[in-house]
Amino acid sequence: MQQLQNIIETAFERRAEITPANADTVTREAVNQVIALLDSGALRVAEKIDGQWVTHQWLKKAVLLSFRINDNQVIEGAESRYFDKVPMKFANYDEALFQKEGFRVVPPAAVRQGAFIARNTVLMPSYVNIGAYVDEGTMVDTWATVGSCAQIGKNVHLSGGVGIGGVLEPLQANPTIIEDNCFIGARSEVVEGVIVEEGSVISMGVYIGQSTRIYDRETGEIHYGRVPAGSVVVSGNLPSKDGKYSLYCAVIVKKVDAKTRGKVGINELLRTID
């Protein structure tokens, strides 16, 4: 694996010079191998190690290099034709392979090659970009978008129209991460490498980026870039220091543990916020 990483790192330093016409065989094979490993879930752009999320920047570099070495080509679709550098993940799937991998794909869901989809996942008409990782038992609902290299945990529900941001550029940015057992409400957006920790519930229409204030009304604490585990979050506003105006924020209205969450439905958690 170290040799593969070295090839990617070296090629990335001269990426501006690389084109589909002049890409050398070693680089091309290394990039294709990484994309295949991401596609199968054998590698992932970010993983939790000793309780901390670690981003493997060289894998993101490999994804970026894939755009340098591959030319656009016609991609056949059921209702149209497309022209892109990245093939579709399911282009060569047959019924046996779908049965083996154990997930459902509802038309016209689109998944790019290099994204991993785990067993018992349901993809409604949605979009999953290259480098993303969608873990077991997750529902990606209608018109939801999972951005490049985003990490989605087990038993997550991404409701209709949810946007999970991609972060291939800038390279130092970490991917957006939704941990296990989270619920993201309809039309909410989580972007810019924000981490939504395990068991959190995000209400409909909540927008969270790195600069969004995440206000815990119980403690008065303000978080940035991280929703603490077990949070129930709604959209709100905080007043300016001079009291002349207010600005958008996300508000943690309560905290729930796994036991409470198991007994009480998502709708009940969101309705009883007073």
UniProtKB/Swiss-Prot annotation:
Keywords, sorted A to Z: Acyltransferase, Amino-acid biosynthesis, Cytoplasm, Diaminopimelate biosynthesis, Lysine biosynthesis, Repeat, Transferase
Keyword Repeat tagged: yes
Main location: cytoplasm
Molecular function via GO: 2,3,4,5-tetrahydropyridine-2,6-dicarboxylate N-succinyltransferase activity; nucleotidyltransferase activity
GO biological process, one term: diaminopimelate biosynthetic process
Reaction catalysed by this enzyme: (S)-2,3,4,5-tetrahydrodipicolinate + succinyl-CoA + H2O = (S)-2-succinylamino-6-oxoheptanedioate + CoA
A single Gene Ontology CC term: cytoplasm
Subunit note: Homotrimer.
Name of this protein: 2,3,4,5-tetrahydropyridine-2,6-dicarboxylate N-succinyltransferase
Organism whose genome encodes this protein: Escherichia coli O6:H1 (strain CFT073 / ATCC 700928 / UPEC)
Taxonomic lineage of the native organism: Bacteria, Pseudomonadati, Pseudomonadota, Gammaproteobacteria, Enterobacterales
Protein encoded by which gene: dapD
